[in-house]
Every structure is written in C-alpha cells, then in structure tokens.
Amino acid sequence: FWVQTNPGTRPGPMMKVASGGELSRFLLALKVVLSDRGSAPTLVFDEIDTGVGGAVADAIGARLARLAGKVQVMAVTHAPQVAARADQHLLISKAALDKGKRVATRVEPLANEHRREEIARMLAGAEITKEARAAAEQLLKAAG
C-alpha cells in the first residue's frame, strides 16, 4: 500500500512512510472492514496499540470493544486503556525453568481486585501506588 500520512508530503510505501501508531490504526481499520464482511469469527490483535499514546489507546480500546459485539476479539496489549475495556482479562507471564534451559508460559484469568491490580501495575510499573490504583479503578468504571 502507498500512503500519504500528512498533507504536503509525498505518498510512499506504507512500511517506510507510516509510523508504528499509524500502522497499528491501519491494521485495526482493515480488520474492522473485513469483519463487516464476515471474514472471520475471531480476530487476533497482537499489540495493536504499539506506538500510540493514552488517548489513541483509549480510542483503540473503544473500537475493539465495539468490534467484540460482532466477533470474538483477542488482543495482546500493554496499554491499560485497552485492557480495561475487555470482557475477560488474562495475564500472560513467562518464567525460566531448569536454570534457564526452558521457559514456561502461564495464562491466568483475572477478576475484580486482581484485574484492578494488574491495570494499576500496567500504569505504574513494579511499585503500585494508591494513585495508580485509583486511576485503574477509574479506567474500569469508564469502560463500563
């Protein structure tokens, strides 16, 4: 695809011209259009929010939530704005085993308090503050 991302610039190949955020939004738009045509009952988005800020991540989360009304949506995200809008939240983690010779992946469903704590961790990092918990609670309330 050739795109023109800003007025006054020349069109060019999307992979060279578009930013990470622009590529993410294009992929989301493309999958939305394809889902309207009944192309797949499940859509998987792997870090669709890469390279975007909080407001755009919130808009992506809202669009994914609307899309989930039509098809099953699975999204891997590091954005708390996206995670807060999910119907189900799974925490995926990896751990080294056998002194680093093997890796095990764990998938843990989160509910209520654990979900709020994970969203707070996504916001604050390793040290979760009361402000991060309050912000996580606000994101969950806003998401409905």
Enumerate the predicted regions with their spans.
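GG-anchored amphipathic helix commonly corresponding to the ABC/SMC/Rad50 NBD signature/C-loop
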Residues: 1, 5-7, 21-43
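Internal helix-turn-beta structural module
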Residues: 1, 17, 27, 116-125
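Short flexible coil/turn linkers enriched for glycine and charged/polar residues
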Residues: 7-11, 22, 101, 113
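Short pre-catalytic strand/loop immediately N-terminal to key active-site residues, enriched for Gly-Thr
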Residues: 11-17
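Conserved D-loop-proximal element of ABC-family nucleotide-binding domains
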Residues: 12, 37-38, 50-58
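Conserved helix-loop functional segments at active or binding sites
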Residues: 32-36, 54, 66
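Walker B catalytic acidic pair
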Residues: 46-47
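C-terminal lobe/lid and adjacent interdomain/linker elements of RecA-like ASCE P-loop ATPase modules
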Residues: 55-144
